[in-house]
């Protein structure tokens, strides 16, 4: 019998499921009856392609496509709403090819397909896929997104179980897991760390360390047969709370018999039993004599030393993995021992922090700093950090903000530049060929040009910086750089600067005919009248261009719009924006970069890098400021132009650009 409320809920859920329609598509296993005209020694049997040439094994894009759309026999086989369609060009090309039937190899192909399906029906594969499928469904029902370290923890669990329970098929199942987690391009040596027998996570407070363990434990004992999972907490009430949460979720999700007895939750099947044991460090011998496949140690930094010896003993078991999860190091040595594993030959330490190691020094020397200056690290939306929180935390306990909230370690680091070495090397080495016709189809058709004029002949002071920047999806491409010095302070100074800018724009448009719009910002802080004259000079030199030429307009003292831009407090935000994009490898240079003023024997990008490396921090009592300091070898004019061009390279203030 069902009560009226339960009956109505079941009815509504059933109706909703009937209405739900998901567009799905997977590759067919129907035998492609097509003759392959090549020597038999070069033939391979591919489950999706049939009998094909062996060279297809070395096409990574083809392999990735087949793995993505392969029919694995479960709900994770496809990505939702991805319908396969043939382009008109492909259909036309295929219609011109004549195919000859080849029924002789049907048996050979069907044998390969049956072997693949047998692999998908194998218990270990269905256990791993079932675990991931249940976890995905549960996360969707919670309407939450996983933190990166939580995904990392799940990968450590599932990859180790696959490696120990299915060593012969580990590679294939691992490729399946990589596709689900969208980590196909990660280095293999990095992925091998998931197979290590132990790993350590040091995570800041309030990041869901214990929360993610509940579904992991539940769906492990639900999907994997004869598995034993251990959970050890630093306090008994924590262990009991997690056990209750796991029991509730098990009784809701698992159709088998669920038994909770003596701090052990068991899932009883017809021919197997899976269990999860929950213990605290106050009972130091509670986990001795057990045989765990996965042992989760929560708040490991605060585990009693006597209990830790019993935990470490499981390292000798070949099929056991120990995962230490804890808050980050505090000021006392007794609760920071996990940082010692950084010295181990294997990479088992994972430190999750708001501050990267390259800039940790600034949080000890500069008390006002609260965020990492490279802007690369992820911070959840439910975490709030500001200077008031830092002062309040440190008022309660000295250095508590760094040690308890930020997730920093006690290790001291030397000062390093704000921009990382990897981002500098990538900007220098990886440059796009923007004259490539295939790439030009994806490049934005608007060129943003920033002009920072300087009216001086002193080369040690400053010159005019000019930069041309465009978009490529979420990336920025530098098309041109100029660093122009006046020969004399004559009446034609504005004409000389305007001519330099026009020549750069003309050169960019000449080799990049896809540009249809040029938007120019001329800084008018030095002289508004001179900026207006520069704008009209640029217009005169580009009068024959087919591109639409627009200038950033600002109201003057009389209320008239004039083609100049007044730089106020934008510079600090622009530098922060540049540092963030640069360290995220989102700023690239064109191989065909235009520059008429930088010496021919000097690479314009290397010239720019000399200035980029001079970006530094200035910390005041109120905030953290950035500056591009000048040196005797290089001025910062070209860099300022690039920074401002990238900052304004968007469509947010389109109405302020007008033709003159």
Curated annotation (Swiss-Prot):
Pfam families: DNA_pack_C, DNA_pack_N
GO cellular component, one term: host cell nucleus
EC numbers, comma separated: 3.1.-.-
Principal EC category: hydrolase
Motif mapping: Walker B motif: 294-299
Cell compartment(s), UniProt: Host nucleus
UniProt KW DNA-binding keyword: yes
GO biological process annotation, one example: chromosome organization
Keywords: DNA-binding, Host nucleus, Hydrolase, Viral genome packaging, Viral release from host cell
Single GO term (MF): DNA binding
Hydrolase is among the record's keywords: yes
Placement of sequence motif Walker A motif: 203-210
UniProt-annotated catalytic positions: 299, 452, 523, 637
Subunit structure: Interacts with the terminase subunits TRM1 and TRM2. Interacts with portal protein.
Function: Component of the molecular motor that translocates viral genomic DNA in empty capsid during DNA packaging. Forms a tripartite terminase complex together with TRM1 and TRM2 in the host cytoplasm. Once the complex reaches the host nucleus, it interacts with the capsid portal vertex. This portal forms a ring in which genomic DNA is translocated into the capsid. TRM3 carries an RNase H-like nuclease activity that plays an important role for the cleavage of concatemeric viral DNA into unit length genomes.
Family affiliation: Belongs to the herpesviridae TRM3 protein family.
The protein's name: Tripartite terminase subunit 3
Gene: TRM3
């Amino acid at each position: 019998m069902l009560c009226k409320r339960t009956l109505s809920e079941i009815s509504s859920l059933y109706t909703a499921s009937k209405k739900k329609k998901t567009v799905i598509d997977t590759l067919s296993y129907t035998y492609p009856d097509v003759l392959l005209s090549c020597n038999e020694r070069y033939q391979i049997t591919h489950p999706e392609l049939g009998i094909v040439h062996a060279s297809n094994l070395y096409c990574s894009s083809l392999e990735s496509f087949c793995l993505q759309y392969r029919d694995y026999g479960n709900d994770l086989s496809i990505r939702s709403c991805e319908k396969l369609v043939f382009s008109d060009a492909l259909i036309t090309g295929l219609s011109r090819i004549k195919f000859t039937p080849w029924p002789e190899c049907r048996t050979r192909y069907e044998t390969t397909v049956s072997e693949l399906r047998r692999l998908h029906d194998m218990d270990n594969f269905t256990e791993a896929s079932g675990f991931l499928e249940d976890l995905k469904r549960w996360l969707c029902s919670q309407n939450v997104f996983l933190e990166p370290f939580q995904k990392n923890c799940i990968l450590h669990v599932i990859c180790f179980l696959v490696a120990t329970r299915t060593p012969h098929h580990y590679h294939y199942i691992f490729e399946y897991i990589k596709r689900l987690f969208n980590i196909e391009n990660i280095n293999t040596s990095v992925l091998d760390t998931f197979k290590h027998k132990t790993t350590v996570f040091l995570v800041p407070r309030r990041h869901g360390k214990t929360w993610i363990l509940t579904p992991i434990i539940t769906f492990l004992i639900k999907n994997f047969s004869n598995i034993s999972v251990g959970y050890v907490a630093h306090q008994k009430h924590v262990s009991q709370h997690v056990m209750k949460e796991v029991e509730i979720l098990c009784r809701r999700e698992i159709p088998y018999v669920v038994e909770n007895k003596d701090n052990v939750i068991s899932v009883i099947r017809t021919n197997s039993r899976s269990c999860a044991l929950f213990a605290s460090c106050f009972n130091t011998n509670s986990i001795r004599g057990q045989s765990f496949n996965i042992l989760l140690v929560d708040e490991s930094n605060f585990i009693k030393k006597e209990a830790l010896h019993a935990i470490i003993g499981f390292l000798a078991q070949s099929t056991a993995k120990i995962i230490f999860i804890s808050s980050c190091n505090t000021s006392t040595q007794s609760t920071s021992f996990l940082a010692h594993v950084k010295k181990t030959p294997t990479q088992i330490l994972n430190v999750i922090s708001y501050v990267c190691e390259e800039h940790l020094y600034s949080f000890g020397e500069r008390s006002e700093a609260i965020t990492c200056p490279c802007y690369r690290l992820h911070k959840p939306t439910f975490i709030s950090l500001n200077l008031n929180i830092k002062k309040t935390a440190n008022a309660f306990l000295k250095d508590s903000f760094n040690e308890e909230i930020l997730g920093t370690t006690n290790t001291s680091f030397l000062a390093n530049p704000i921009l990382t070495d990897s981002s500098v090397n990538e900007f220098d080495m990886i440059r796009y060929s923007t004259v490539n016709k295939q790439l030009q189809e994806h490049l934005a058709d608007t060129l943003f040009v920033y002009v920072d004029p300087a009216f001086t002949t002193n080369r040690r002071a400053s010159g005019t910086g000019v930069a041309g920047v465009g978009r490529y999806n979420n990336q920025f491409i530098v098309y041109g750089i100029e660093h122009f010095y006046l020969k004399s302070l004559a009446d034609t100074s504005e004409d000389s600067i305007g001519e330099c800018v026009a020549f750069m724009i003309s050169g960019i448009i000449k080799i990049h005919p896809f540009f249809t719009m040029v938007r120019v910002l001329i800084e008018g802080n030095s002289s508004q009248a001179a900026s207006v004259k520069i704008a009209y000079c640029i217009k005169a030199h580009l009068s024959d261009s087919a591109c639409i030429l627009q200038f950033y307009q600002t109201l003057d003292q009389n209320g008239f719009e004039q083609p100049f831009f007044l730089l106020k407090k934008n510079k600090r935000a622009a530098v922060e924006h540049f540092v963030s994009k640069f360290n995220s490898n989102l700023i690239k240079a064109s191989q065909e970069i235009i520059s008429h003023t930088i010496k021919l024997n000097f690479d314009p990008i290397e010239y720019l890098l000399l200035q980029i490396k001079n970006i530094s921090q200035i910390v005041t009592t109120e905030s953290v400021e950035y500056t591009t300091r000048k040196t005797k070898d290089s001025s910062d004019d070209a860099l300022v132009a690039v920074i401002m061009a990238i900052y304004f390279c968007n469509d947010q203030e389109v109405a302020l650009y007008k033709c003159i």
